[in-house]
Swiss-Prot record:
Function: Binds to sodium channels (Nav) and affects the channel activation process.
Organism listed in the record: Androctonus crassicauda (Arabian fat-tailed scorpion)
Location in the cell: Secreted
Listed name of the protein: Toxin b subunit alpha
Residue ranges that the Swiss-Prot or TrEMBL entry lists as coiled coil: none
Superkingdom of origin: Eukaryota
Molecular function via GO: sodium channel regulator activity; toxin activity
Record text on subunit structure and interactions: Toxin b is a heterodimer composed of toxin alpha and toxin beta.
Cystine bridges: none
Tissues where this protein is expressed: Expressed by the venom gland.
The keyword Secreted is annotated on this UniProt entry: yes
């Protein structure tokens, strides 16, 4: 979900709309 602030991880996963519950970990 691209509504989250883009860090190096969710910049990729976030805009894919994948489950980011485990993506935000380092």
């Amino acid at each position: 979900d691209d509504l989250h602030p883009f860090n190096e991880n969710n910049m990729y996963y976030g805009c894919k709309g994948l489950s980011n519950s485990n993506k935000f970990e380092d």
